[in-house]
């Protein structure tokens, strides 16, 4: 069997195929996917500003972390299953199901009367969100050749960036003027529009010959069960490590070890005949560059959430910005990812090489995160805005070029499993991108409190042992006298500095790994069993060509 790299070499010696061009249906599908991605992106960040108000209203206490983690957990653990479902039942119905699940979860969150109901709604939302974002990339991969894929990924990235940027802004505005419940109710009309749009235009091929029970037998039930259970165990450990339980406690170590052991067993089963249709075939990770891309996908995803969850802490507890103003102040970290993604996509399409893009992008991220360590009480608007722009531009370049690079090493028939694996790694990185800086932040806060950095014992008790993140708001700080405010702001500032000091190491390692990447030719033709349902002439026939013709 020929490898993708050898296929690329054969293409260079054969006549160039006619340039691929999208038609109306492709654009219509991209618009529909854009609306669904806007939904998912908004919900990823909308609570970064609104969280303190929501948590106080529902009296969640120490369980507040599950409002975020339930979303991450379900969106990550379900990805391999969604990828396999899309191969078995087709992209159309699985995507429509994901949108419906997301809207259902949003309704439950908006109507939540208890913390448990909110957490359950967030878990359901996460299932839909993970499916929406991952399936969008699978569908784009079915419709667009690898060499041109970056352009369409940039479109979705721009929408994700706009949604991520609007999330804190909308969340802050809604909390300040209406009710936090509309943070979730807003998804209902938008979700309805996206469902109708995709129902009309998303008509792509799938295997209609197999019976329902034949399709069910193809599902790797054991593999999916292990992945879900392992992800739950790891996230449970990370949720309470350093807050309810010490990192060295058996309450933390046992679920953490069980989770990683489960993932190790899962990886082993993927190489055996026990998995007739593996979720993540080991052939995806045979090339050294594939392994590097997987590691750097994890790191870049972790660094993104590192910033999204701790920049608001700096803005609200150190700069004393209101939720609405903090939402506006986060615009650079989200919006500057858009031109970064476009530059990365254009470079990928123009030269067909991802290594130079990754080197430059991770260099920018490392520089920007280093500048974040300069954050203090008197940091100017120009400083924090420019520093965010540097990190965001590099992150945008990484996002649009990492998946096409990872897909370059696999055949088109594996596109769904490959994309699901990549997104699983990425969302797994999001989980650690909250857990690692949170542990660093809490540890630094406790150390400073132990040194007597805050003179008022009641304040120290409030923000000790993991309470600092929940209390990170201007309203909390401003209720105290001026001298005590300065002490609180100083403690938060020093903790934030330590958080970003550690992030430099992660970005630096990723930068060094990019130097070891090897470029592989990106395919200019497309062979897929999941092309557009309605065949056209000329170029469209080439797009819909089947791998087994």
Curated annotation (Swiss-Prot):
Keyword Iron-sulfur attached: no
Molecular function, one GO term: transmembrane transporter activity
Glycosylation site residues: 151
Pfam families in alphabetical order: MFS_1
Membrane topology summary: Multi-pass membrane protein
Subcellular location, record wording: Membrane
Keywords noted in UniProt: Glycoprotein, Membrane, Transmembrane, Transmembrane helix, Transport
Membrane spanning stretches: 29-49, 63-83, 99-119, 126-146, 155-175, 182-202, 221-241, 249-269, 291-311, 328-348, 355-375, 390-410, 421-441, 502-522
Recorded coiled-coil stretches: none
CC annotations in GO: plasma membrane
PROSITE patterns from the UniProt entry: MFS
Main localization, broad class: membrane
InterPro entries: MFS, MFS_dom, MFS_trans_sf
Keyword Membrane attached: yes
UniProt cross-references to PANTHER family, sorted A to Z: MAJOR FACILITATOR SUPERFAMILY, MAJOR FACILITATOR SUPERFAMILY (MFS) PROFILE DOMAIN-CONTAINING PROTEIN
Family: Belongs to the major facilitator superfamily.
Stated role: MFS efflux transporter; part of the gene cluster that mediates the biosynthesis of wortmanamides A and B, reduced long-chain polyketides amidated with a specific omega-amino acid, 5-aminopentanoic acid (5PA).
UniProt-recorded name of the protein: MFS-type transporter TwmF
Species for this entry: Talaromyces wortmannii (Penicillium wortmannii)
